[in-house]
Swiss-Prot record:
CDD domains: YlxS_C (cd01734). Keywords: Cytoplasm, Ribosome biogenesis. It is found in: Cytoplasm. This is Ribosome maturation factor RimP. Belongs to the RimP family. The keyword Transferase does not apply. It comes from Desulfosudis oleivorans (strain DSM 6200 / JCM 39069 / Hxd3) (Desulfococcus oleovorans).
Length: 161
């Protein structure tokens, strides 16, 4: 998953060690062209159970990442960097996320149809052998991890996942 964007791949390599050193988990990286220009978004989660991501955490990571980008990716100019909490409906970006959040309600979108559909909302059963298992209306779907273009937790009735 990740679409093969080389900037996103470089960002993971540069930013993940910074986040880990600060007790944060890098959850997801986006690099998009939007109406206001190019936007680089980093989504974080706390590496400490029952602790959220604070504004100070985001600001600290932002300062460090800006410095890294200036040194290692100087060709990346004229962009906006946004650093925020992944939130209750956090993206699932790594294969291990699909195991960690087994039992949670999720939304998944695929690149190609799986059983004649591309969008799924159901209970995540886990991942094995490169396949994500999902229960939707009492039916189990097996979705190849490599076909997933977007996945996130679904927050139901204000209850965090």
């Amino acid at each position: 998953m990740g679409g093969g964007n080389p900037v996103v791949a470089q960002m993971w390599k540069l930013v993940e060690p910074v986040c880990s050193a600060e007790g944060m988990e890098l959850v997801f990286v986006e690099f998009n062209k939007e109406s206001q220009g190019r936007v680089l978004r980093l989504y974080l989660a706390s590496g400490v159970p029952d602790r959220g991501v604070t504004l100070e955490d985001c600001a600290g990571i932002s300062r460090q990442v800006n410095g890294l980008l200036d040194v290692y990716l100087p060709e990346l100019d004229n962009y906006t960097l946004e650093v925020s909490s992944a939130g209750l409906e956090r993206p699932l970006a790594k294969e291990i996320d699909f195991e960690r959040f087994a039992g949670s309600r999720v939304k998944i979108r695929t690149a190609a149809p799986v059983s004649d559909r591309k969008n799924f909302t159901g209970i995540l059963l886990g991942v094995s052998d490169g396949n994500v298992r999902l229960m939707v209306d009492d039916k189990t779907f097996v979705i190849p991890y490599g076909e997933i273009t977007r996945a996130k937790l679904v927050n139901e009735d204000g209850v965090s996942q």
